Amino acid sequence: MLSDELESKPELLVQFVQNTSIPLGQGLVESEAKDITCLSLLPVTEASECSRLMLPDDTTNHSNSSKEVPSSAVLRSLRVNVGPDGEETRAQTVQKSPEFLSTSESSSLLQDLQPSDSTSFILLNLTRAGLGSSAEHLVFVQDEAEDSGNDFLSSESTDSSIPWFLRVQELAHDSLIAATRAQLAKNAKTSSNGENVHLGSGDGQSKDSGPLPQVEKKLKCTVEGCDRTFVWPAHFKYHLKTHRNDRSFICPAEGCGKSFYVLQRLKVHMRTHNGEKPFMCHESGCGKQFTTAGNLKNHRRIHTGEKPFLCEAQGCGRSFAEYSSLRKHLVVHSGEKPHQCQVCGKTFSQSGSRNVHMRKHHLQLGAAGSQEQEQTAEPLMGSSLLEEASVPSKNLVSMNSQPSLGGESLNLPNTNSILGVDDEVLAEGSPRSLSSVPDVTHHLVTMQSGRQSYEVSVLTAVNPQELLNQGDLTERRT
């Protein structure tokens, strides 16, 4: 388990590596010895002493330059074990061979660690030569995952021939790994809470910038009058096809001919022809199937009652289960009425409102108009037809006594009484019959008398002689 101090200040490790010079091998030779002062951050006991570290002038005299060093000036490593309850326990410390430690100077190098200290890290305050007390701090942390079976500087793996700076390098490397993991864990925790953590470039402190900002939509439609913006180039490319009406994917089904902008829409459309509905609602008692996953997702909101699409217009507050419904609703607030009635010219904001208007008014009006035409349609010789043609009624044959001539037989007194009668020509009780088949288009009446038949045009009939001369009255012998 990493300590709270490590999680809050993991940047100390990075600063130490950047600002501290550590030899990489025994071939490194420095002409002068440098004082490395120990700045104590831990409680100092009476038995604690510090000694000066002398970097040797020549790497070949390591075996001959060893001097006796007090036992309190040795470098110790901390062995940490994780107990069964998840808490860290301090194990025994292992003493390192003081091969390169010198007692010729009184400057302190390292500080003894208290065996009773229960923290899980070691603070070794090392400074570069000339920096003094302004040196950066180093936090040495041993990775928990490597504690078991691979303790750093354990008594079994300790070798007096290994230089101390290699061990410090290894310890610093492990500490950097642990600190990086701690920082990543902290970033993941803050990201889950909706916060974005940035590391400052100047002071190295982490700062919370608040909620995550929305993704910037950089792709804007260049078509005049269109202000749509997009994040993904694929969506932007699809939108441009709508302006060009580029429907390059055509349905191959016979008699369909529908076209689409993208291939995926065509594939979904083909399911309407083959009847495929691969997406099923698994709610109890439902079992409805859909052609697309989006339709199934919208359908499930019926069961859950979820309406995630909220109208942001002031004072509205309506919410919808589908985004398409929200877009249709927004037209109401914009005042646009793009849907027009083809009969009366009235405009509507929604196509559904226009369709309701058509069914309510114009369909009833059309039915009423046809019914009125049927009711006002008079018989073939009706007076309204004659008045419309501006023909005097006294010169024509009138049949007002019969509502219809469709297939009915009319009894006439005699054949000579058809013409020249002012009011009514057709009278009941005649032994002779007239079979009339009305022709609404030509307004003709066929009359029979014995073996002879006559066709009379009622619009031009004046007298029998004129009818014969003009061809309005014809005689057929059968």
Swiss-Prot record:
One CC-aspect GO term: chromosome
Keyword terms, alphabetized: Activator, Chromosome, DNA-binding, Glycoprotein, Metal-binding, Nucleus, Repeat, Transcription, Transcription regulation, Ubl conjugation, Zinc, Zinc-finger
Residues annotated as binding Zn(2+) 3: C281, C286, H299, H303
Binding site for Zn(2+) 1: C221, C226, H239, H243
Tissue expr: Widely expressed.
Annotated source species: Homo sapiens
Subunit structure: Interacts with CDKN2A/p14ARF.
Protein name per UniProt: Zinc finger protein 410
Inducing or repressing factors: During fibroblast senescence.
SUPFAM superfamilies per the UniProt record, alphabetical: beta-beta-alpha zinc fingers (SSF57667)
Binding site for Zn(2+) 5: C341, C344, H357, H361
Post-translational modification: Sumoylated. Sumoylation increases its half-life, possibly by blocking ubiquitin-mediated degradation. O-glycosylated. O-GlcNAcylation may occur in response to increasing glucose levels and affect transcription factor activity.
Main location: nucleus
Region spans: Disordered: 187-213
Zinc finger annotations (C2H2-type) as residue ranges: 219-243, 249-273, 279-303, 309-333, 339-362
Single biological process term from Gene Ontology: regulation of transcription by RNA polymerase II
Binding site for Zn(2+) 2: C251, C256, H269, H273
Record's subcellular location: Nucleus; Chromosome
Function: Transcription factor that binds to the sequence motif 5'-CATCCCATAATA-3', and is specifically required to silence expression of fetal hemoglobin in adult erythroid cells. Prevents expression of fetal hemoglobin genes HBG1 and HBG2 through CHD4: acts as a direct transcriptional activator of CHD4, a central component of the NuRD complex that represses transcription of fetal hemoglobin genes HBG1 and HBG2 in erythroid cells. May also activate transcription of matrix-remodeling genes such as MMP1 during fibroblast senescence.
Binding site for Zn(2+) 4: C311, C316, H329, H333
Annotated domain remarks: The five zinc finger domains are necessary and sufficient to bind to DNA.
Entry's Gene Ontology molecular function annotations: DNA-binding transcription factor activity; RNA polymerase II cis-regulatory region sequence-specific DNA binding; sequence-specific double-stranded DNA binding; transcription coregulator activity; zinc ion binding
Taxonomy of the source species: Eukaryota, Metazoa, Chordata, Craniata, Vertebrata
